[in-house]
Amino acid sequence: MTTPLTFDNIRRAPKALLHDHLDGGLRPSTVLELAEQYGYEDLPAHDADGLATFFRTAAHSGSLVRYLEPFAHTVGVMQNPDALHRVARECVEDLAADNVVYAEVRFAPELHIDGGLSLDAVVDAVLAGFADGEKAAAADGRAITVRCLVTAMRHAARSREIAELAIRFRDKGVVGFDIAGAEAGYPPSRHLDAFEYMRSNNARFTIHAGEAFGLPSIHEAIAFCGADRLGHGVRIVDDIEIDADGNAKLGRLASLLRDKRIPFEMCPSSNVQTGAVASIAEHPFDRLARLRFRVTVNTDNRLMSDTSMSMEMLRLVEAFGYGWSDLERFTINAMKSAFIAFDERLAIIDEVIKPRYAVLVG
């Protein structure tokens, strides 16, 4: 008998997460405690509920630039090793509680050196937190594998340095590289040196593209930079025409991405908040899924969007009528697209995801 598609049952399903920002997923209570512990005095609220409301309201701005402003407060309390370790450990624990079995969590080390830490010390603290979180989750009966992506800020000039950091830590838990931040005025091609360095070292990377900016951003990310995945990529719909009969005609860029099986790290709730789409119901996720693009479900920033993987899946189920087989496909899409070794990906798919979905499907 098929299990009903309720929120509680979706929470039971195994999940794979590719696009989650460490500084966008703190517990409100942790932000408060770290601010008090380390003397951060600029918080806009001084109780957990008020702080959660602030982050959610501020992020729901209709603009990517304004959406990013509240991160000053989370980054502000993440400037020493103990804070970074705690945030990383709690991130893993929270994901495991939502039955995420594999996650790639990203963060920008350059944003965490105001307290005097080196870039290497920042990454060391985060990776140690991830490892401790994995151990705690396993002890609780919720095994999870978490790997790290290091991100360079696209408005800064440190992308090559951060790419080198990714390579230094590639055997210690860092599996890839990314650029993030406001897209307008900061095209991916500005960071070609970093991407060429990653490619020359046989390393993987994703690029935030096609979120707040259009097709040129996606084209550069793929054609010039050689991205393995796309962060968001919602504007690819601008290269897909739908005729009066509902038939889709793909442009050359959209065709290339589908043919090459380029994964889309789609973050529905976040895209509504930033104004990339008007609503979940109008999100291009479903159109792309039906056209067999490799779409994946992601959280982006769990604190700012007041969300989880289970909540993102539920919203898609409610908007588009998906069933368990659809959620399983999106999960396997993500696992196939992870930046870990093929045999590790296959083991999680065959030994964890498929058996647990078989129980839910009945």
From Swiss-Prot:
One of its GO terms (molecular function) is zinc ion binding. Binds 1 zinc ion per subunit. The active site is at 211 (proton donor). Pfam families: A_deaminase. InterPro entries: A_deaminase, A_deaminase_dom, Ado/ade_deaminase, Metal_Hydrolase. Its EC number is 3.5.4.4. Its cofactor is Zn(2+). Substrate binds at residues 21, 23, 181. It catalyses: adenosine + H2O + H(+) = inosine + NH4(+); 2'-deoxyadenosine + H2O + H(+) = 2'-deoxyinosine + NH4(+). Keywords: Hydrolase, Metal-binding, Nucleotide metabolism, Zinc. Zn(2+) binds at residues 19, 21, 208, 300. The record marks 232 as: Important for catalytic activity. GO terms for biological process: adenosine catabolic process; hypoxanthine salvage; inosine biosynthetic process; nucleotide metabolic process; purine ribonucleoside monophosphate biosynthetic process. The keyword ATP-binding does not apply. One of its GO terms (cellular component) is cytosol. Belongs to the metallo-dependent hydrolases superfamily. Adenosine and AMP deaminases family. Adenosine deaminase subfamily. PANTHER family: ADENOSINE DEAMINASE. Catalyzes the hydrolytic deamination of adenosine and 2-deoxyadenosine. This is Adenosine deaminase. It comes from Mycolicibacterium vanbaalenii (strain DSM 7251 / JCM 13017 / BCRC 16820 / KCTC 9966 / NRRL B-24157 / PYR-1) (Mycobacterium vanbaalenii). The gene is add.
